[in-house]
Amino acid sequence: MKTIIINKPGEVEIIEQAMPVRKQGEALLKILYGGICGSDLGTYRGTFAYASYPRIPGHEFSAEIIEIDDNDRNLKPGMIVTCNPYFNCGHCYSCQRGLVNCCTSNETMGAQRDGAFSEYITMPIERIYDGKGLSAKTLALIEPFCISYHGISRANIQPNDKVLVIGAGTIGVLAAVAAKAKGAKVYISDVAENKMNYAIETFGLDGGILNDSPENFIKRVEEITNGNYFDVTIEAVGLPSTFQACIDAAAFGARMIQIGVGKRTHEFDFTLLQKKELNVYGSRNALKKDFLELIDLVKSGKVDLEKIVTNTYNLDEADKAFQDFSKNAASMLKVVIKF
């Protein structure tokens, strides 16, 4: 079978591997679509905090069940599914409290362990979710939506909250979509105006703030909020400058959610946290309930996830997909590979 591998930063190769052999309690899956996550792109660029090499990327995917044992989840061969790619130990303090997304030994596919970008993989049955008739392309987008949705849930967003999402990549846009679904007034900010405007127009967001300078950014924040700033700010980039922007744009008593993953350290005036009495939340991975709730939400027709896909490549074009995405990240929103 064919497998995509990142040998080192900037080097993607398609290699031949033996078919995986499933163990008891696992299913054999045929991968149908895989989305290139920002962390996969970071691994390709050498900027992802958890990257090691060589690495098979991919944790956003859909698949067809080829072989599976009898199970109590009603999963059968031929079903189109998606999966939870965050492997937890089940024994640490976090896992014991049900916070499996915060497992101290977490291994996410494509990051701490090899990912799904092969023609076939095996997967523990308990990590497989029935796609309920959603298309294979849509199901490959459920996992990034879960990342955003989990972060939004941390903020306890209320109807008419003023929300600012910084970062118009996949996670940021889907965070905006999730906040909008909760009745909030949602604005998005980015340095790439075309990408920002695409998100606003495609998903009916309330507006945008071009982050071309700190001064212009704050001026627009004040104009939009009548000087009151935002009830919720969401960092979906992973840079020190955008973290600072979230703090600066937050109202007194606001909630700030950190979803973006970065590699850099940052010095900032921490007294702003005290002065504004900010509630700052980290958000990591997602939970089973996020997957189940979002599959149902998308199935209801309230959200069209496929609108986020701007580019689709075939498996044999994997190297080109990574090259193009790396060079054109300012204009390419979600890139998927058809297997």
State what each model feature region is.
Residues 244-248, 288-339:
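C-terminal hydrophobic helical "lid"/dimerization subdomain
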Residues 201-279:
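Glycine-rich cofactor phosphate-binding loops and adjacent beta1-alpha1 units
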Residues 20-34, 47-93, 132-134:
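Glycine-rich beta-strand-centered segment in the early N-terminal region that forms part
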Residues 255, 268-307:
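Rossmann-fold dehydrogenase core element
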Residues 134-213:
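Mid-domain Rossmann-like dinucleotide-binding core that forms the NAD(H)/NADP(H) cofactor-binding site
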Residues 89-166:
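NAD(P)H dinucleotide-binding glycine-rich loop of Rossmann-like/cofactor-binding domains
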